[in-house]
Amino acid sequence: MPTWIPNNLCAQPTTRNAKPPSNGHPQATQQQSAPGSLAYRNSSNIPNGATNHVRQQKWQYTRSGHRKMADGEAVISTVNNVEEVHGQLFEVAPRYVNLSYIGEGAYGMVASALDTITRDRVAIKKISPFEHQTFCQRTLREIKILNRFKHENIINIQEIIRSETVDSLKDIYIVQCLMETDLYKLLKTQKLSNDHVCYFLYQILRGLKYIHSANVLHRDLKPSNLLLNTTCDLKICDFGLARVTDPQTDHTGFLTEYVATRWYRAPEIMLNSKGYTKSIDVWSVGCILAEMLSNRPLFPGKHYLDQLNLILAVVGSPSNADLQCIINDKARSYLISLPHKPKQPWARLYPGADPRALDLLDKMLTFNPHNRIDIEQALAHPYLEQYYDPGDEPVCEEPFTLEMEFDDLPKEKLKELIWEEAEAHHRRMEAEAAARNNGGQNPV
């Protein structure tokens, strides 16, 4: 396994021609002891992460504990336990202070903050979803899923800050562990060694095995949803588009509101094949693996047809058996009308890549979802043999059921459910804290 990432990983290209020592580990001039408890780390040294890139994101503080502003940065002010970040008010004090802007999306902003109890920096996601049903659905879905997930390769929820009553609920704050960067940012600046491609891929699949065992499809796997820290720990995030699926049910026509990033969509999603299965996530992981090998998206389609044509130009025209999986007559007719396209050799697309990585890539990016490799098979692939450990690849003990979906509920009801989930999380955290204080015994 890789025991380090050079200190300049996220600032300058790494040196790739240094020969590894006899134990198969890349030669390192600096190593650090492994924090954490992942059993698949069989060494006291673990990857050292994107150090310089992360250093550029560190914050400077005055002696009083207030953060210094960088040139051109929006001012962050604190009044009455409320901090302003890029025009957004974060009501998270007094526990969380010294906020720093990280990013924002359609209905929320993310900031880092200092937890005054643990003295750790955390990530706080402020979400204001209650004007739109779709945003409420995604918020509730993510909270329900992450409240029940507990896995080292999946982002956790440390705390949910909400109003005292559902009627006064306008915003919700989700506190999570702070991860210094993500795979998208990393690939924008650095070429990964094969060791790190392998290590990251294993962690993705390890987390996805847990997700799929819970009868959940992530549906939006992409580099920006894979968080990384300085020790190269990887965590899957953003479950707003995830869906519960029943392996015993025919999901023909399922996932009608699929809006995930086009570049990582499986072809069956665009072609309306018979049902949607866990294989859609496997396709996305294949696209991510290809991107780690080259720092370029494999299928950067500009629109629906362009996306499909880019896929066919690489994996080749579908066979007659593949076409039978497509129930949309227009889609099938379109594919039949296209000139035959041969499959491209992966070694030509990625010269110098580990042949085992390319073999796994080929099995992930198989056009027919019924012939695509599954997560358990991918974990057992020879490319990942140095990490593969079925005894340390846990599954979810309580899988989700279809009754836990809520597509047709009005936003007012969704708001109530969000508040109830936040309240349930708060009670569970209090019970766990009481149990710890009681010597591990359940509180009376």
From Swiss-Prot:
PROSITE patterns: MAPK, PROTEIN_KINASE_ATP, PROTEIN_KINASE_DOM, PROTEIN_KINASE_ST. Changing residue 106 to V: In ku1; loss of function and ATP-binding. Lack of tail swelling, severe constipation and loss of ilys-3 expression up-regulation following M.nematophilium infection. Expressed in cells lining the rectum. Isoform a is expressed in nervous system, body wall muscles and posterior intestine. Isoform b expression may be restricted to germline. ATP binds at residues 102-110, 125. Residues 1-17, 24-56 have a biased composition (Polar residues). Residues 1-56 are annotated as: Disordered. The modification Phosphothreonine is found at residue 256. It is an enzyme of class 2 (transferase). Disruption phenotype: RNAi-mediated knockdown causes an increase in the number of germline cells in the mitotic zone, a lack of transition zone and a defect in pachytene progression resulting in a proximal gonad devoid of nuclei. Causes sterility. RNAi-mediated knockdown in adults decreases lifespan. RNAi-mediated knockdown of isoform b in lip-1 and puf-8 double mutant causes a decrease in number of germline tumors. RNAi-mediated knockdown causes a reduction in intestinal ilys-3 expression in response to M.nematophilum-mediated bacterial infection. Activated by dual phosphorylation at Thr-256 and Tyr-258. May be inactivated by lip-1-mediated dephosphorylation. A motif (TXY) lies at residues 256-258. The keyword Magnesium applies. Its cofactor is Mg(2+). The modification Phosphotyrosine is found at residue 258. Residues 96-384 form the Protein kinase domain. GO terms for molecular function: ATP binding; MAP kinase activity; metal ion binding; protein serine kinase activity; protein serine/threonine kinase activity. The keyword Phosphoprotein applies. One of its GO terms (cellular component) is nucleus. Keywords: ATP-binding, Cell cycle, Differentiation, Kinase, Magnesium, Meiosis, Metal-binding, Nucleotide-binding, Oogenesis, Phosphoprotein, Serine/threonine-protein kinase, Transferase. Its EC number is 2.7.11.24. It catalyses: L-seryl-[protein] + ATP = O-phospho-L-seryl-[protein] + ADP + H(+); L-threonyl-[protein] + ATP = O-phospho-L-threonyl-[protein] + ADP + H(+). Isoform a interacts with gck-1 (via N-terminus). Belongs to the protein kinase superfamily. CMGC Ser/Thr protein kinase family. MAP kinase subfamily. The TXY motif contains the threonine and tyrosine residues whose phosphorylation activates the MAP kinases. This is Mitogen-activated protein kinase mpk-1. It comes from Caenorhabditis elegans. The lineage of its organism: Eukaryota, Metazoa, Ecdysozoa, Nematoda, Chromadorea. The gene is mpk-1.
